[in-house]
Amino acid sequence: MKEKPTIQRGYMQFVYKGARRERSDITGVKFIPHANGPVRILEPPLWEITEDKQPGESIEEYEDRKKLESETIATKINNLYVAGIDGIDIGASETSDQTRDPSKFCTMIKRRVYGLKEPTYVAYYLDRPNDIREAYIQSIALLMWYNCQANLEATRTSVLTYARDNKFM
């Protein structure tokens, strides 16, 4: 019987090669667990899984994953994950107090078919931070961690502008 997946909450954080916090010094991304974090992880990228049996993973899935890991998982796989971003252009601090139930910034990550594994959502970011740039940073870090591209809502593309201006593209 398949166990219910454990959802980890936390934040994404860039890893830098030195003390400078410049885009050119980013060497990777890591997930920092935190009980109130806006990022939810149901399954880390396959190349990040190091434990034996994952919470929620059936015996069949575990055996299939171990077989695949012995073949090639040490490197990042292109096009295994895909993302969708439903963006907002202003943060909570720029939103009127009279605005009822303002929408949140959302990024969803989905794993495509891999081996015997069915496609499934593996992570998401959902928040309306005071500074909208925090949503951009969390989303870009998620995209980098999962090595994936994103589809953007056509009318809310400020995350794209932010990524270009900060040389993530």
Where are these regions (language model features)?
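RNase H-like, metal-dependent nuclease domains and their acidic two-metal-ion catalytic environment used
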Residues: M1-M169
